[in-house]
């Protein structure tokens, strides 16, 4: 994922990120991910995998945005997109979490199909996934355009 520092591994329907260097893990951000106010994040459990830190993400009852978008009509898709923007704002309001550590690929934004509630993948690591907010916004915009175009087909 990030120049060999983080490796992604599929675990059935779930997935995990394995950190090559355990000092990259940030415990404060990990604890904030489990706060009452962080219900916009996919559930994450820290474990050990062959002596390395593994961040295991539970995707139970959620579908990736890339798949869910195909099942939505126009009104439903607008609702999902609105929920994404709402949850992005909640991340910025949190104060302890950073937008720059959200994995916002279309296959890493998760949607509860029953409620259209959004769950993001957050990596509590030292390195950012995006260099700044402008890059984050461009990546998010591109992901949303790609997803909405795919839903139209």
Please give the residue ranges for each predicted region:
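Generic beta-strand structural signal
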Residues: 10, 48, 111-113
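Catalytic activation segment of kinase domains across protein kinase-like and atypical kinase folds
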Residues: 100-144
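Gram-positive cell-envelope targeting signals
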Residues: 1-5
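Conserved structural core of kinase catalytic domains
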Residues: 16-24, 29-78
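Conserved small/polar residues in nucleotide/adenosyl-binding loops
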Residues: 146-153
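Protein kinase catalytic-loop region centered on the HRD/HxD motif
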Residues: 89-98
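Conserved alphaE helix
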Residues: 76-87
């Amino acid at each position: 994922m990030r120049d060999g520092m983080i490796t992604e591994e599929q675990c059935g329907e779930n997935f995990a990120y394995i950190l090559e260097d355990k000092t990259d893990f940030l415990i404060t951000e990990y604890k904030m991910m489990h706060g009452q106010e962080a219900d916009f994040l996919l559930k994450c459990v820290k474990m050990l995998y062959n002596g390395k830190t593994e961040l295991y993400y539970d995707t139970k009852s959620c579908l990736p945005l890339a798949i869910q978008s195909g099942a939505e009509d126009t009104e439903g898709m607008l609702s999902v997109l609105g929920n994404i923007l709402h949850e992005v704002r909640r991340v910025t309001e949190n104060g302890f979490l950073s937008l720059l550590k959200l994995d916002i690929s279309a296959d890493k934004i998760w949607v509860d199909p029953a409620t259209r509630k959004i769950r993001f993948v957050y990596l509590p690591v030292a390195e950012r996934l995006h260099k700044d907010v402008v890059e984050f916004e461009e990546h998010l915009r591109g992901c949303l355009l790609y997803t909405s175009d795919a839903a139209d087909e």
